[in-house]
């Protein structure tokens, strides 16, 4: 790897020492951040091509602000004051015999695990703690990680009352869909059940945050796309039985977020409700416990379907969608074109309508939003319907992908996955 000084001498020798310090700081940051080096180097090259030092200085300041913002956002994605352990009961018994004490332990009967939350001292080292536990139990029979945070994504292009495309107008739907009683799980923010869209809906809720008034915009929107029974804005499956796990909390500093703990507890509850699919319209960083929980969900014969993310074409993979046990959904508009802010990558499985989608708005009325979150319900409903006649998720997915319309490069691609969803 080239040294910072070599990079500066080779590429930025015309810049005076003041600006060289700024460039050196940026490159130094990039060299210790996997996947960022080339991006920063390219951006610096563009900056240096500007005609005047004044413009260079302003561009450098903007780039520095952007990088600092990214660092701040990443820090907010983790609760560093405690760490998590998840394993089967016999592992916890073994750890207890070796002197490990866990204050908050939850039984996850649906998943078959115990989940412990442990206060983390200032000197906490995740890698050392994980290695110590593995040494005691003789292998990786436990998952150890931090409590990462996840977001539902900011709705893009929120429009006025009754704007946008009604979900039922975007795809050719089978005639039996309006009468099917599908058991569908949702992991999201809370649902405004007082909305007219849910006047006759079957919605069972369970809250996994302590907030007495959790946010409800996103959950209300997703639930209505699936199961609204308002004649003027019918959902895809108005007779579906929804089991809504409310996992989002809200603070002034962090905004709306869901923790790893709340997600795992929600998955556990939904398994006990005998749902066939779980709609997960949120995204965030990878987490070992969440990955294991989702693998167990799949072992139980339940299919998790998640949003690919709204970070843009150059963004890193988002989770849980990027896990192999999860169906990753991207969004398209009403002409089949890819949503401009959608993530891309090899993990993308299938595309569905997700641009300018009409949905119920918490507090009353309707609005329209765009994002991969709003595409997930289409795939969720299609999968739930197919699972009624074929209970094996792998076989059902083969059929679902085979029926998709290939709208990108031939075969599976990083923009549309297997193609645009079609109901069979």
Whereabouts are the PLM-identified features?
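Protease zymogen maturation seam
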Residues: 110-115, 124-200, 415, 424
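Mature extracellular/periplasmic domains of secretome proteins
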Residues: 174-179, 256-277, 288-304, 314-328, ...
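Catalytic-core environment of secreted peptidases
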Residues: 187, 192-198, 203-205, 331-373, ...
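Subtilisin-like serine protease catalytic core
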Residues: 40, 173-184, 190-203, 210-260, ...
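Inhibitory N-terminal propeptides of secreted protease zymogens
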Residues: 40-153, 277
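Hydrolase catalytic cores
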Residues: 226, 245-247, 354-424
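C-terminal subdomain of the subtilisin-like protease fold in secreted/lumenal serine endopeptidases
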Residues: 68-73, 267, 274-282, 288, ...
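Bacterial N-terminal signal peptides
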Residues: 21-30
